[in-house]
Amino acid sequence: MMTMKARLGMAFDFKKEYKEFYLPKNTPSIVTVPSMNYIAVRGQGDPNEEDGTYKQAIGLLYGIAFTIKMSKLGDHRIEGYFDYVVPPLEGFWWQNGVAGIDYAHKEAFRWISVIRLPDFVTKADFDWAVEEAARKKKTDFSKVEFLTYDEGLCVQCMHIGPYDDEPDTVERMHRYMEEQGYTLDISDQRLHHEIYLSDARRVAPEKLKTVIRHPIRKG
Protein backbone atom coordinates (compact mmCIF):
# COMPACT_ATOMS: atom_id res chain seq x y z
CA MET A 1 0.00 0.00 0.00
CA MET A 2 1.37 3.41 -0.96
CA THR A 3 1.85 5.70 2.01
CA MET A 4 0.33 9.18 2.24
CA LYS A 5 3.81 10.71 2.11
CA ALA A 6 4.62 8.73 -1.03
CA ARG A 7 1.44 9.98 -2.66
CA LEU A 8 2.47 13.53 -1.79
CA GLY A 9 5.89 12.98 -3.39
CA MET A 10 7.79 12.84 -0.09
CA ALA A 11 10.41 10.14 0.51
CA PHE A 12 9.37 7.68 3.22
CA ASP A 13 11.88 7.76 6.10
CA PHE A 14 11.87 4.59 8.21
CA LYS A 15 13.62 6.36 11.09
CA LYS A 16 10.85 8.94 11.39
CA GLU A 17 7.91 6.62 10.65
CA TYR A 18 9.09 3.90 13.06
CA LYS A 19 10.59 5.96 15.86
CA GLU A 20 10.03 3.16 18.38
CA PHE A 21 12.65 1.08 16.52
CA TYR A 22 15.11 3.74 15.34
CA LEU A 23 14.86 6.69 17.73
CA PRO A 24 14.43 5.38 21.28
CA LYS A 25 15.32 7.55 24.26
CA ASN A 26 18.69 7.29 25.97
CA THR A 27 16.99 5.43 28.80
CA PRO A 28 16.31 1.68 28.40
CA SER A 29 12.92 0.45 27.20
CA ILE A 30 11.24 -2.82 26.23
CA VAL A 31 10.15 -3.28 22.60
CA THR A 32 8.80 -6.06 20.40
CA VAL A 33 10.41 -5.93 16.96
CA PRO A 34 8.51 -7.54 14.06
CA SER A 35 10.03 -9.66 11.31
CA MET A 36 11.94 -7.57 8.74
CA ASN A 37 13.86 -8.25 5.53
CA TYR A 38 17.43 -7.06 5.09
CA ILE A 39 20.30 -6.86 2.65
CA ALA A 40 23.02 -8.75 4.55
CA VAL A 41 26.72 -9.60 4.41
CA ARG A 42 28.37 -11.94 6.92
CA GLY A 43 31.98 -11.67 8.03
CA GLN A 44 34.47 -11.62 10.86
CA GLY A 45 37.30 -9.46 12.14
CA ASP A 46 37.98 -5.97 13.47
CA PRO A 47 35.52 -3.45 11.95
CA ASN A 48 38.12 -0.69 12.29
CA GLU A 49 40.64 -2.38 10.00
CA GLU A 50 41.45 -0.19 7.00
CA ASP A 51 40.13 -1.79 3.80
CA GLY A 52 39.11 -4.79 5.91
CA THR A 53 36.22 -7.16 5.27
CA TYR A 54 33.80 -5.04 7.33
CA LYS A 55 34.36 -1.89 5.29
CA GLN A 56 34.13 -3.94 2.10
CA ALA A 57 30.82 -5.37 3.31
CA ILE A 58 29.40 -1.89 3.84
CA GLY A 59 30.26 -1.01 0.24
CA LEU A 60 28.41 -4.09 -0.99
CA LEU A 61 25.34 -3.30 1.13
CA TYR A 62 25.02 0.26 -0.14
CA GLY A 63 25.64 -0.89 -3.70
CA ILE A 64 22.52 -3.06 -3.52
CA ALA A 65 20.52 -0.57 -1.43
CA PHE A 66 20.91 2.22 -3.97
CA THR A 67 20.38 -0.08 -6.95
CA ILE A 68 16.96 -0.92 -5.48
CA LYS A 69 16.16 2.68 -4.54
CA MET A 70 17.08 4.00 -7.99
CA SER A 71 15.25 1.23 -9.87
CA LYS A 72 12.50 3.80 -10.42
CA LEU A 73 14.72 5.38 -13.09
CA GLY A 74 15.24 2.18 -15.09
CA ASP A 75 13.28 -0.54 -16.84
CA HIS A 76 12.86 -2.84 -13.83
CA ARG A 77 9.55 -2.12 -12.13
CA ILE A 78 9.07 -3.14 -8.49
CA GLU A 79 5.41 -3.67 -7.65
CA GLY A 80 4.27 -1.34 -4.87
CA TYR A 81 7.41 0.80 -5.07
CA PHE A 82 7.39 4.21 -3.39
CA ASP A 83 10.29 6.58 -2.87
CA TYR A 84 12.13 6.21 0.43
CA VAL A 85 15.25 7.18 2.33
CA VAL A 86 17.71 4.27 2.48
CA PRO A 87 17.50 3.02 6.10
CA PRO A 88 20.54 3.22 8.38
CA LEU A 89 23.34 0.68 8.55
CA GLU A 90 22.85 -1.98 11.23
CA GLY A 91 24.88 -4.86 12.59
CA PHE A 92 24.41 -8.11 14.50
CA TRP A 93 27.52 -8.99 16.51
CA TRP A 94 28.91 -11.96 18.44
CA GLN A 95 32.12 -13.75 19.41
CA ASN A 96 32.52 -17.50 19.65
CA GLY A 97 32.71 -18.70 23.24
CA VAL A 98 31.79 -15.29 24.68
CA ALA A 99 28.51 -14.43 26.41
CA GLY A 100 27.68 -11.02 24.96
CA ILE A 101 30.47 -8.83 23.55
CA ASP A 102 34.12 -8.49 24.59
CA TYR A 103 35.09 -5.05 23.28
CA ALA A 104 38.77 -5.62 24.10
CA HIS A 105 39.08 -8.28 21.40
CA LYS A 106 37.63 -6.76 18.24
CA GLU A 107 39.66 -9.13 16.07
CA ALA A 108 37.39 -11.94 17.33
CA PHE A 109 34.19 -10.23 16.18
CA ARG A 110 31.80 -12.11 13.95
CA TRP A 111 29.07 -10.02 12.38
CA ILE A 112 26.17 -9.74 10.00
CA SER A 113 26.10 -6.24 8.54
CA VAL A 114 22.64 -5.28 7.25
CA ILE A 115 20.44 -2.57 5.74
CA ARG A 116 16.68 -2.92 6.02
CA LEU A 117 14.63 -3.51 2.87
CA PRO A 118 11.20 -1.96 2.29
CA ASP A 119 8.44 -4.57 2.50
CA PHE A 120 7.66 -4.20 -1.21
CA VAL A 121 11.06 -5.65 -2.18
CA THR A 122 10.68 -9.37 -2.98
CA LYS A 123 13.45 -11.97 -3.19
CA ALA A 124 13.12 -11.75 -6.99
CA ASP A 125 13.62 -7.96 -6.87
CA PHE A 126 16.64 -8.48 -4.63
CA ASP A 127 18.15 -11.03 -7.01
CA TRP A 128 17.66 -8.59 -9.89
CA ALA A 129 19.44 -5.85 -7.90
CA VAL A 130 22.42 -8.13 -7.19
CA GLU A 131 22.80 -8.94 -10.89
CA GLU A 132 22.28 -5.32 -11.92
CA ALA A 133 24.80 -3.96 -9.40
CA ALA A 134 27.38 -6.57 -10.42
CA ARG A 135 26.89 -5.69 -14.10
CA LYS A 136 27.10 -1.92 -13.62
CA LYS A 137 29.84 -1.77 -10.99
CA LYS A 138 31.92 -4.71 -12.25
CA THR A 139 32.08 -5.93 -8.64
CA ASP A 140 31.48 -9.34 -7.07
CA PHE A 141 28.28 -9.16 -5.01
CA SER A 142 28.07 -12.91 -4.33
CA LYS A 143 28.50 -12.40 -0.55
CA VAL A 144 25.29 -10.39 -0.33
CA GLU A 145 22.18 -12.24 0.85
CA PHE A 146 18.47 -11.66 1.42
CA LEU A 147 17.93 -12.10 5.18
CA THR A 148 14.63 -12.33 7.05
CA TYR A 149 15.06 -11.78 10.80
CA ASP A 150 12.33 -11.92 13.44
CA GLU A 151 13.87 -10.16 16.42
CA GLY A 152 10.95 -10.30 18.84
CA LEU A 153 11.10 -9.14 22.47
CA CYS A 154 14.10 -6.90 23.25
CA VAL A 155 15.52 -4.27 25.57
CA GLN A 156 17.00 -1.28 23.76
CA CYS A 157 18.54 2.12 24.42
CA MET A 158 20.03 5.03 22.51
CA HIS A 159 23.78 5.13 23.18
CA ILE A 160 25.37 8.55 22.70
CA GLY A 161 29.15 8.52 22.59
CA PRO A 162 32.08 6.39 21.40
CA TYR A 163 31.50 2.76 20.50
CA ASP A 164 34.03 1.70 23.14
CA ASP A 165 31.79 3.22 25.83
CA GLU A 166 28.87 0.97 24.91
CA PRO A 167 29.40 -1.39 27.91
CA ASP A 168 28.10 1.34 30.25
CA THR A 169 24.85 1.60 28.26
CA VAL A 170 24.57 -2.20 28.05
CA GLU A 171 24.93 -2.42 31.83
CA ARG A 172 22.05 0.04 32.29
CA MET A 173 19.94 -1.95 29.82
CA HIS A 174 20.53 -5.21 31.67
CA ARG A 175 19.80 -3.64 35.05
CA TYR A 176 16.51 -2.21 33.74
CA MET A 177 15.61 -5.52 32.09
CA GLU A 178 16.09 -7.41 35.36
CA GLU A 179 14.08 -4.82 37.31
CA GLN A 180 11.20 -5.38 34.87
CA GLY A 181 11.31 -9.16 35.32
CA TYR A 182 13.12 -10.13 32.11
CA THR A 183 16.16 -12.31 31.40
CA LEU A 184 18.81 -11.80 28.74
CA ASP A 185 18.26 -14.22 25.83
CA ILE A 186 21.35 -13.85 23.62
CA SER A 187 22.03 -17.04 21.65
CA ASP A 188 23.27 -18.22 18.26
CA GLN A 189 19.91 -17.15 16.83
CA ARG A 190 19.32 -13.98 18.89
CA LEU A 191 22.19 -11.51 18.75
CA HIS A 192 23.60 -8.22 20.04
CA HIS A 193 22.18 -5.64 17.61
CA GLU A 194 23.35 -2.11 16.80
CA ILE A 195 21.78 0.54 14.54
CA TYR A 196 24.12 3.33 13.42
CA LEU A 197 22.39 6.69 13.18
CA SER A 198 25.61 8.70 12.75
CA ASP A 199 28.37 8.61 10.17
CA ALA A 200 31.51 7.92 12.21
CA ARG A 201 33.61 9.54 9.47
CA ARG A 202 31.88 12.89 9.97
CA VAL A 203 30.63 12.96 13.57
CA ALA A 204 32.79 13.40 16.67
CA PRO A 205 32.99 10.21 18.78
CA GLU A 206 31.26 11.81 21.77
CA LYS A 207 28.25 12.68 19.57
CA LEU A 208 27.76 9.33 17.83
CA LYS A 209 24.22 7.96 18.14
CA THR A 210 23.81 4.17 18.17
CA VAL A 211 20.73 2.15 19.04
CA ILE A 212 21.76 -0.91 21.08
CA ARG A 213 19.30 -3.80 21.29
CA HIS A 214 19.47 -7.10 23.18
CA PRO A 215 17.02 -10.02 23.00
CA ILE A 216 15.22 -10.89 26.22
CA ARG A 217 12.57 -13.26 27.57
CA LYS A 218 10.13 -13.06 30.43
CA GLY A 219 11.23 -14.53 33.76
What are these regions (language model features)?
Residues 3-219:
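A solvent-exposed interaction/effector surface
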